[in-house]
């Protein structure tokens, strides 16, 4: 009987140690996940990159990111204020920052099928959906009624020259949509008609002019 009790105590001790190691392991995993999330947030919130932003006179400092940078996007009164990159394919900048380093927050980037000077009738820009309105996480606000009316201006710099943006529609679409996600196969008229018919919100006061271009900002929905 005494031997049995010792065996039980021994097993209890082993079980306690196993549970301790399991909980310690889970705790360490939790710490790493928190640290990893912090690093992702820090990368997406790196305001030091703003020193490479052109000013309204078209003057920008020497940019180590200029090789793959095709523009700069700013949406007024939001946190969207980022360089626009373009890769050889649409996977290149999913997890790469504008300096070419690995980053889970990735970069804001132009569809690889579009021309880099934004001369296409319709261009498509992607960005990760991040918390705290970082990257294209701020686009969530446009799903609220009335938000578009008060936050419909922005600027896109192309070759350091500023062009005014007017946001006129908000919508949701499947990633397989052949009009929205095939930028080089649709002209501005076709895209505009589709958007008008399917948008959640559409500003009827905005009229397309002859040389106007359409630019879509796309992010995932969670």
Question: Which residue stretches match the model-derived regions?
Answer:
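N-terminal Sec-pathway targeting helices
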Residues: 2-26
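Solvent-exposed, non-transmembrane regions of membrane-associated and secreted proteins
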Residues: 27-222
